[in-house]
Amino acid sequence: MAPAVTGKAPPPASSPAPATHLSPAALPSQDRTCPPPAPARAPPPPSQAGGPQLCDAILPGVNPLVAGTAVTPIPDSPRPDYLVPTQDPAFRSCVVRVTDNQARQQTEQTPYLRNDYSRRQAFNADSSRFLLEDTAGFWHVFDAHTGQPLQVLDNLTGDATRLAGDAEPFWHPTDPNRLYFLPTNGLGMQIFQLDLGTRTVTTVADMGPQIRQVWPDADMAYTKAEGSPSADGRYWCLMARHYDDAGSQPMRGVFTWDLQENRLVGTLAMDSAPDHVSMSPSGRYCVVSHEKASGPGTRAYNRTFSTPYNEQITAGYLQLHENSEHSDIAFNRQLQDAYVAIDYQSNTGDVFMHNLDTDRRTTLFPTYLDRTAFSIHVSGKAYARPGWALVTTYGEYHADAMDSVLPPEQRQWPHRKMFAVSLDEQPQVRTIAAIHPNVYQYEDEPHGTVNRDFTRMLFNSTWDGGSVNDMEVFMVAVPSDALDQPS
């Protein structure tokens, strides 16, 4: 049976289908429930920086990365063994399998581990740790140098589900031992901070009193699982909703919170709930992303939601796209915010960037190649490496045989890969790794994400497997100067 296409890739010249969300951990925010309590665990010692790392022996042979858009055949290769560094045979990067889900199932009957989403920054401030979620909704911290698990973020302050499900963990921008998180589904309208060494939780923002001055019956404040604060952690764009019951959370509006000054800086009333909201990396703009069927598509507002939008644009918002697609917001080389997304409605299915300062849209590359199409994820989280975004691709097929596996001889240059694309008028491409994504359900989509300096990446993959049960998480490493090599 052919793998299912569960993302948002339509056949050329047709409309996309929404992604399928299947497990409690993958369901849309308002539908997710807290996982059951888990036994207490003692915190391990902090990860030690500076020691040997998994890919030390391979990294000297990685450069240069394969540049350009020529079709490079992807050879068959066995799935890497657990925690054994492997060099990608076609693209030379270091690939390490950092989970052993099948062994976990055989010995512990525990949920599968997976990288949560491409828009979530999985790596902490110094890339010494990364974060995975299990399919029951608990979050796990791993040592990024060794790949070893460090701790499960449960039983915090005696509460088994304090940080669980849609708690939206965000790493602190400078302190590798801390992360922010929200109440599950934003219920309570607070922002918390966790110290990983002591497992102590502090409330850094109690937004409720100020939000209720605007919307008296608001109960929830969150991004709906797919947004991020600004790169420096100061500004947060969140949606406010009323909580009626498990099946009804009426929308009230969108707002910006200044965590440094602990105050509400702008609000916008809104009746229809967006797919998600996010602050731009600079903190200047709030991006509100609606599905076309339920709202006005994807728009950017300044953080005070005032008119004019900025000194160049007199309207009150910037229309970025007519729909909500797989996308992210990155820094370009000038440290301007760039919305990077795919336009399935365009004639060639273009991946594009839209400058949030200037309103300039630039095509990065087409995806409808020789009557094929595919799905993508975008990660713009390399804030310390401005001007690049990570793209992972999956679910490729031919328009004349949508339910069949695309034969290798029909594959196009982007298919089944992870690559960096530069955010330039004449974009460059650097292919990083083959990701072998046979996708069967939402949980095993790649959801590739990148660290702040574009040296480490995570992705999910069944590695050419026959079912979602083959899904594992892989870490990819490249040298710090990999994107600087001439094309």
Show the residue positions of the predicted features.
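Asp-box/WD-like beta-propeller blade repeats and closely related beta-sheet repeat scaffolds
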Residues: 155-244
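Loop/turn-rich, solvent-exposed surfaces of beta-rich toroidal or solenoidal domains
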Residues: 342-352, 362-437
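Blade-loop segments of beta-propeller domains
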Residues: 111-120, 134-182
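Residue position within the beta-strands of beta-propeller blades
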Residues: 132-133, 178-181, 236-239, 285-289, ...
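Blade-level signature of beta-propeller repeat domains, shared across WD40, Kelch, NHL, RCC1
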Residues: 444-487
